[in-house]
Amino acid sequence: MASGGGGGNTGAGGGPGMGLSLGLGLGLSLGMSEATSEAEEEAATAEAVGRLATTLWLRLRGWEAVLAAAQRLLVWEKPLHSLVTAAALNGLFWLLSSSSLRPFFLLSVSLLAYFLLDLWQPRFLPDVSASSPEEPHSDSEGAGSGARPHLLSVPELCRYLAESWLTFQIHLQELLQYKRQNPAQFCVRVCSGCAVLAVLGHYVPGIMISYIVLLSILLWPLVVYHELIQRMYTRLEPLLMQLDYSMKAEANALHHKHDKRKRQGKNAPPGGDEPLAETESESEAELAGFSPVVDVKKTALALAITDSELSDEEASILESGGFSVSRATTPQLTDVSEDLDQQSLPSEPEETLSRDLGEGEEGELAPPEDLLGRPQALSRQALDSEEEEEDVAAKETLLRLSSPLHFVNTHFNGAGSPPDGVKCSPGGPVETLSPETVSGGLTALPGTLSPPLCLVGSDPAPSPSILPPVPQDSPQPLPAPEEEEALTTEDFELLDQGELEQLNAELGLEPETPPKPPDAPPLGPDIHSLVQSDQEAQAVAEP
C-alpha cells in the first residue's frame, strides 16, 4: 500500500513537468514549422519569379533595341527626340478622342498592330541575343542588347515585370479571400469606391482622366530617373524654413499682443478704449527702444574670449611665480634664473620690486648664528685682498638697478634701536647692508641712491613700521602680505649727501670702505670683519 501510494505521488509529481516539456516541444515544433513554411514560400516565390522572368525574356529578347530606345525617350536622354515623341502622342490621343470611332474599333486596331509587329519582327529586327535562356541576367547579354549601364536591360525589365505580376496576383488572392470571409464589409467598400468614381466621372470628363493617366505614364520615368522631386525639395527647403520661422514669430507676436491686451483690459478702469490704445502703443515703442538687438555670434565670441582671459590678481600671482602670462592664452613656464640674470626693464617695476623683496627677506631671515659664536678678532688683510672683486661685484649690481631710486626693504627683523635719536630699521643683522655699502654705492654711481638701514629720527611721532626690539637670537615672525606692502611704502625716506655724511660721522665709519652689493649677503671673512666694525660702531655710539 505504501509503495503504491509512493508510486502514485511520483506520477502526480511528474505530471506538471511532463506537461511543461510537452508544451515547450509543441511551441518549438510550431515555430520551426512556421519558419520552414516561410522559407518554403520564399523559395517557391523566387522560383516562380525566375520562371516568369525567363518566359518574358524569351518573348522580348528580339525587342531589346526597341525597348532601349523607348527607355531613352521616356527618360529624356535626348530632349529633342523626347519632345517630338511627346507631341506626337498628344496629337494622336486628341485625334482619337475627337473621332467618332468606337472604343471596340480602337481596341481591335491596337491588337492588329501588335500581331503584325510580332509577325514582321524577325525581318526588321534581327535577333542579336546569343546567351542561353537559363542565364537571363548575364552581363554579356546586357552589353549585346545595346542598353546603357544607367538604363534597364531586358533581363532586369523582365524580372521587375515578373515581380509586379506576382505581387498583383497575391493581392488579388487576398482580396478574394477577404470577400469570402467578410462579404458585408467587402460589399460596403466596393460600393463606396464605385460611388466615388461615379461622382468623379460626373464632374471630370473621362477623356481628361485618360489624358492625365497618359501624362503620368510619360513623365513618371523622367521624374524618377533625374530625381526631380529631391532636387526641388533641396532648393525649396531654405525658403520653407524661413517661411516657417517667420510664421512662428508672427504667431508668437500676435499671441503676446493678445495676452497684453487682456492684462491691460483687466487692470484698466472702466473707461474709454482709445486712451488704452494710445498707452499701449507708447509702452510698446518705449520697450522697443530699451530692448537692443543681440547678435548671437558676437555674443558667443565675446563670452568665449572673456572666459579665456585671466584676472589681474591671477596674472600678478603667475608673474611672481615665474610664469610668462599673456591675455587669452595659457601661462607658459619660463626659467626664473634667466629672468633674474637679465636687466630689469623700466616697464616692469612691480616684478623687480617683488624679486628684490624676496632676496632681501632670504638674506635677513637667516642670521649667521654660527658666526656669532666665533672669535671677534679678525684681520683686515682679507678685506684688502678682496677689494677688487667687491668693486667689480658692486658695479655689476649697481648697473642692474632698474631706476635711480632703487629701494631695499629693511623692515623684517629688528635687532634694537640705537640711541642718540637714530632709529634703525627693523631689518636683520646689520652686516647684511652696512652704511659703508651705502656710501660706497653713492661714490660709485652718484645718480643712484639706496636708503641706509638707519634713518635719522626727524619725525616727532614714531613711524608705525618700527617694530619693538626683539633679542638677536629669537627670529621675528613674518608679517602678512598686506602689511608688507603698507610697510614697504612707509619705511623709505630719501636722504641727501649731507645727511649721509653726518650719519657716517656719528657712527665713526670711514667713507673709503669698498661697497658691497645690497642684494647679496657677504661671504667668507668679510662677514666677520663687518660684524667687528658694526660692534665698534655701536660701542662708539653708546653714551
Swiss-Prot record:
Compositional bias (Pro residues): 461-480, 512-524
Biased composition (Acidic residues): 275-285
Keyword terms of this UniProt record: Autophagy, Endoplasmic reticulum, Membrane, Phosphoprotein, Transmembrane, Transmembrane helix
Compositional bias of kind Basic residues: 254-265
Gene Ontology cellular-component terms listed: endoplasmic reticulum membrane; membrane
Compartment(s) where it occurs, according to its Swiss-Prot or TrEMBL record: Endoplasmic reticulum membrane
Motif (LIR motif) on chain: 490-495
Membrane topology of the entry: Multi-pass membrane protein
GTP-binding recorded as keyword: no
InterPro entries: ER_autophagy_membrane_reg, RETR2_RHD
Molecular-function annotations in GO: endoplasmic reticulum-autophagosome adaptor activity
Phosphothreonine: modified positions: 279, 334
Oligomeric form and interacting partners: Interacts with ATG8 family modifier proteins MAP1LC3A, MAP1LC3B, MAP1LC3C, GABARAP, GABARAPL1 and GABARAPL2. Shows higher affinity for GABARAPL1 than for MAP1LC3B. Interacts with CANX.
Entry comment, domain topic: The LIR motif interacts with ATG8 family proteins.
Name recorded for this polypeptide: Reticulophagy regulator 2
Protein's organism: Homo sapiens (Human)
Gene assigned in the entry: RETREG2
